[in-house]
Amino acid sequence: MRVAATRRNVLALVVILSAVCALVGLAALTIGGVHLTLGEVWAVLRGTSSNPEATAIVSEIRWPRVALAALVGASLAVAGTVLQALLRNPLADPYVLGVSSGAALGDILALWVGGRVAAAAPGLAFAGALLTTAWVYALGRRGGRLKSFTLLLAGVVTASFLSAIILFVLTLLSARDVRGAAFWLMGDLSAATGVELRLLAPAVIASIAVLYWFSKDLNVMLLGEDEAAHLGVNVARVETVVFLLSSLLTGLAVSASGAIGYLGLLVPHLGRMLVGSDHRTLLPTAALGGAIVLVLSDTLARTVVAPSELPVGAVTAVAGAPVFIYLLRRTAG
Amino acid sequence: MLLIFLGAAALARPAALQARVVVDETGRRVNVPDHPQRLVSLAPSITETLYALGLGDRLVGDTDYCDYPPQAKLKPHVGNVLNPSLEKIVALKPDLVLGIAEANRRQTADQLQRLGIPLYGLTDHTLDDTLRSIADLGRALDCNVAATALEQNLRRRVAEVERRVAGEARPKVLFVVWHQPLTTAGPHTFISDVIHRAGGVSISDDLKSEWPGLTLEAALDRDPDVILFPSHVELSPPLDEIKRLPGWREFRAVKQNRLYVVSESIIHPSPRLIDALEQVAAILHPEAFAMAASDEWRVASDEQQAPGFSSRREGFACSSLATRHLSLTATLTGLPPQQIEAAQ
């Protein structure tokens, strides 16, 4: 299916997906370890609840978590979408390319150093993501051309190398920090706090807006670098913006919630099936779709083995890995 | 106006009006109510201590792993030790939550702080820490008399064990937290301390981390006189099976049949840790305990049951083993197999 990228269509798409996102979010706010009715949740949201426990549960525990899932989901899905366009590779994804591992290493190094550096963990995660992106991109280029499989292999090997370093750093951490870090590495949204959200939300929304501004250029980039240059696209500038912002989105997402895999692969693919590959419609679809998918995944993670919890990364991997293999077979064919 | 005033008065909790700020064992400043009435425990050892202090009826919630005493299993559970459900804690309306720095996650502490629920944190690295925690809890929970009596009784039993093993040769002990891969207890753990107080010496006291891995070769080279396993079915297979494993059968301790299963209370820093101490001491120095009327030191125990060799299982998972398992899982998730598969 393909949706023409008229302003009206894009607006309608955003409205519809936002409505779905809100519904999924409301469902996620209603489901949890303590039974609350939809009416009670609604009362808290409207500020008319007289039940202090319900208010604390919905506004202090569930809402930050649902909002964080939405922001992280949008970040990873958009990062995946723009990387796929830039690298002209449907298999590109921050997790598969090792960018998430780079971010995780940066974050965990900050934790190890501790003190004031620990507070700057998201910055180090961004740096880790950016360095890994540049490194994998350099490895994937041969004689000025991007080789699809070289790029993927470079990403996979880099990811495993970085994971090994992460394990090494984990042994240096105190037992108490290891517990937190091990949880976080598997993808953990439970540490969501209001403060983090206030920092994360503007950065994520601004990054996505800037990337949207480049969506026409990204369409042209799909034709190839030379063709894009001939058609008047400033290729170097698009590359710089995409690398910087996809690294920023990945770094922030990983810093907030650990390495959640395959979202950047699964969501853009679903988005293309839904609206086609024009980035003017695809980018908003991926952003809102990523939010919907991660909120859903996290709700599943919280409920399937209740009262315990699965790491949300396990849920996204179960759904995402088969899609990766399917895409791999199609690309290879 | 009157209505507003009444409403505000109804919302304020009486206990909160009389709170005092104390510094807990982890160095956090905690607003502890003067007479905490609704306690939530985040670790089995704390649950055990609360019951030992006679505070079982003030406990309104504990973890899935809290199985001792048996009444603890009937309390509402707030989830597991590493990842308790915050919403369930909130719903139980506790006026004080009790946690332990070596078992719970820092994130849990931060989140409770944000929710305005006071958390009193304990730390447990040695047997003395455990005894001190009992006294500390007594102060925080306004039950000094019971705590002092319990602490003194336990100290007497510790002193009695130490008296009996004093001057005896110290056998080398391998404590098996996990047999495959071999994981043992490091120096800053109450397990190592129990072995030491029981008149033994742990062969892993030179290792740095709390729950270090040890290669089988290194363990063989250190030639332990005695090998101890905590009673936990899932983690330690039957001794007969272990004795036949390649490598393991080379241990002198195996050839001399000096493998023992000790009560899993050894991995709980609770009053029952002293049961484990007595048991380990009797294993390491049977002669020192055989000469006296063998019942004497058992009678001293507060528990109805003798510090038995009974094999109870669930409790173990709550301890740092869960952690160990977690980091192992993280090892696996570092590079998902799908990635490798896909790359080929």
Regions found by a protein language model. Give the residues of each.
Chain B
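Extracytoplasmic substrate-binding proteins
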Residues: 22, 28-29, 96, 106-183, ...
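A short, structured surface patch at a secondary-structure boundary
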Residues: 20, 37-103, 108, 203, ...
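Bacterial N-terminal signal peptides
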Residues: 1-10
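His/Asp/Glu-enriched short active-site or ligand-binding loop at hydrolase and phosphoryl-transfer sites
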Residues: 63, 188-211, 231, 260
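Short, basic, low-complexity termini and linkers enriched in Ser/Thr/Gly/Pro
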Residues: 12-16, 293-328
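Short secondary-structure boundary segments
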Residues: 43, 101-102, 177, 207, ...
